[in-house]
Amino acid sequence: LSLRLTEQAKKVVHIPHLLYYWRSSPTSVASNISAKMYCLEAAMKALRAHYKRVGVPVDDVTMIPNTPGFYKTDYTITKPGKVSILIPSCDHGADLRTCVDSIYRKTTYADFEVLIIENNSKEDGTFRLYEQLQKEHPDNLRVLYWKGTGFNYSALNNFGAKEATGEYLLLLNNDTEVITPRWLEEMVMYAQQERVGCVGVKLLYPDNTIQHAGIGFGYLTLAAHMHKNFPVGHPGYMGRLVYAQDVYAVTAACLMVRKSVYDEVNGLDESFAVAFNDVDFCVRVREAGYTNVFTPFAQLYHYESK
């Protein structure tokens, strides 16, 4: 019923008052979802019917393991395209090697290119690494040389975006490592949707606690990573660590966006050289009429200190 109502509704609002109390009994799902297991299958059937009615192609709808009542939709990738992975780099060759190796070793999405954006490195070993990586991946890895000075994350990515040949841009920190092989598929299935702007992923610290699972506003500080430091297996508040959802913003440590959207909002604001460039970008994307999405089904390590 709710799905059919939202198919017709122009706007859905929340009324912050208790309007109804539900009686809980041993035979009710209000006390235990296992009381009526057939409801879980019925819910997936209802979701599949909903997608069919609204004309959204999906490959499957499945229940998320160990979280009955939460479901994963695998949207059909109807707009496949090249993903341009932009990686700003300044020395720290070991981090870059780990990042790039994980991309090529694990990624199952075939159509991508890697653009390493060189930013005033000093170590000879860094440039030897660039040469080696280009020899290993001559068909789809390039090193771009930014002519600016100092560090400006926004300017680096804007420079890389101009050189990118893909329909999708993926901003990626060099201190990350891919965990899930289908990470690009999981991101593209949302980034392809006209309503979607930015797509972010679940990032983990090396100790398998949450580094990023979406950014919220007004919690402890102006903008903060939600569920930061939660253990990786924790479902989060109302299950928010286990299902894809709209969020206000996502980190640019791993952020996918259609190149057309990136260009529409004029890329990252270069006045935000180090911090808040991603938050500002996501806000402008929302103001342009898009929503931002967090998916926990694409996971990477982010070797950032706590």
For each feature predicted by the language model, list its residue ranges:
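A short, conserved alpha-helix in the catalytic core of glycosyltransferases
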Residues: 1-17, 47, 183-187, 241-266, ...
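Conserved donor NDP-sugar-binding/catalytic core segment of glycosyltransferases
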Residues: 9, 25, 176-221
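Cell-envelope/extracellular polymer assembly enzymes that use nucleotide-activated donors
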Residues: 81-86, 113, 280
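Short, acidic, metal-binding catalytic loop of nucleotide-sugar glycosyltransferases
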Residues: 101-111
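A conserved acidic beta->alpha catalytic loop
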Residues: 118-129, 148, 177
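Conserved donor nucleotide-binding strand/loop of the catalytic core
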Residues: 130-155, 163
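A recurrent flexible, glycine/aromatic-enriched loop bordering the glycosyltransferase active site
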Residues: 152-155, 162, 218-260, 264
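Short aromatic/hydrophobic "clamp" motif used to bind/position activated sugar donors
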Residues: 169
